[in-house]
């Protein structure tokens, strides 16, 4: 399985998203991997652009899967929720339910969607999953939660 082409994914996402290809070193394996960097049209609470990445990776069974990953926003926020008050716990339950119903995984500090080889071949399906993850990021990072005192 291969990553969708930049042009095909750009067409499937629409002109408000920006797709570019870059190479980076995987921190775990040390290998250089190709990553599609997707800049969304949305801003986080600090007015920084929200982005997600799309990369190939082999799972423990030896299957190559596509991973759509939020490497910063919702992951950081979700892992800090237990330090918040009661409304934070309610928000976490709501977000976990949302994640379950959108084929999304929260694991080891990352929020991501795994796509099987047959799903990864359809650029429209991939684009819809990117949009689903973006929606979750927007919902999670805009939750009005006040921090408790330590």
Where would I find each of the regions flagged by the language model?
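Hydrophobic, aromatic-enriched interface-forming segments
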Residues: 132-150
């Amino acid at each position: 399985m291969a990553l969708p082409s930049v042009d095909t994914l750009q067409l499937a996402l629409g002109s408000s998203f920006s797709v570019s290809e870059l190479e980076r070193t995987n921190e775990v394996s040390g290998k250089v991997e190709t990553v599609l960097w997707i800049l969304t049209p949305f801003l986080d609470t600090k007015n920084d652009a929200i982005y997600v990445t799309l990369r190939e990776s082999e799972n423990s069974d030896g299957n190559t899967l596509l991973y759509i990953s939020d490497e910063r926003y919702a992951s950081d926020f979700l892992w800090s929720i237990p330090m918040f008050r009661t409304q934070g716990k309610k928000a976490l339950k709501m977000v976990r339910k949302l994640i379950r119903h959108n084929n999304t995984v929260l694991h080891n500090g990352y929020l991501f969607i795994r796509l099987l080889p047959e799903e990864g071949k359809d650029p429209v399906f991939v684009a819809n999953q990117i949009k689903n993850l973006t929606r979750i990021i927007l919902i999670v990072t805009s939750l009005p939660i006040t921090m408790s005192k330590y």
